[in-house]
From Swiss-Prot:
Positions contributing to Fe cation binding: H111, H115, D300
Enzyme class name: transferase
EC number: 2.3.1.234
Family: Belongs to the KAE1 / TsaD family.
Cofactor(s) listed: Fe(2+)
Cofactor note: Binds 1 Fe(2+) ion per subunit.
Binding site for substrate: L134, V135, S136, G137, G138, D167, G180, N272
Subcellular location: Cytoplasm
Secretion signal span: none
Cellular component terms (Gene Ontology): cytoplasm
Record-linked Pfam families: TsaD
Protein name, UniProt field: tRNA N6-adenosine threonylcarbamoyltransferase
Amino acid sequence: MRVLGIETSCDETGVAVYDDEQGLLSHTLYSQVKLHADYGGVVPELASRDHVRKIVPLVKQALADANCTLDDIDGVAYTKGPGLVGALLVGACMGRALAYSWGKPAVGVHHMEGHLLAPMLEDDVPEFPFLALLVSGGHSMLVGVEGIGQYEVLGESVDDAAGEAFDKTAKLMGLDYPGGPRLSKLAAKGETGHYRFPRPMTDRPGLDFSFSGLKTFAANTIAKEPDDEQTRANIARAFEEAVVDTLSIKCRRALKQTGYKRLVVAGGVSANTRLRTTLAETMQAQGGQVYYPRGEFCTDNGAMIAYAGLQRLKAGHIEDLGVKGEPRWPLDTLPAV
């Protein structure tokens, strides 16, 4: 089976073609980073309009790169949610229109299921069951995964997601958008031990996260310290260490609770070098293994949507002609495959 996947949940337009025998045949991506940089964050209306401009050329490019015609495509998958409703509707309209005009089945994919399954695009594929840590700009959650669609949300953020905390703290430090990667780059120049940030909600039972307090702590620290490059780097280092330690502590707690020996880490924050190193050490100490998608599949992309959609289309999960976007969509409400 061969599926065209479309991703438009936020500020990346991604289109890919995935074949269940040959693997990933093409992967095209357009980022709106330059468009939103002047505003310090994503402007939903501008994001939607830019998706409209870019999506048709990217579909054509993905088909050409895969050496495919419409006759070679067996189904269409598009991100149905969660995300920015206007952006979602652009991808949903395109996906539904292509499916209808080509006479192919279509399915709306959960954005976070796409991230969760992104490591399946690699050569070293995790076996079920496993624990998934999903960390992005909009979500931070720990999920017990018994199979595709068999998800138990063990813990999630009660306020800011980890990626959101990175971006907001970066903005407080005067760093350009996108702030998270720039903060991590600055943190690499910092020295440890100068500041001690809290590790939120690690002093109590449970697996939920809270990162808004870290942002406030960072704001207060920035306000009272000298505004020189090394001080800013030291603050960035302390902030990053606090986020990574918090995620690591919760992962260890969840692994002990579930007994799983495999950990999948996905979403935009999974590209963070310190997080990868820390969790690799954690799993090695526990005799387990950690799995990540490659860097280009940590952020939003069409390849993960094509893969996830293919699994659901093969299981007969076909949607009607209605065009729907789900800005809020609990992961654990998905049907099993």
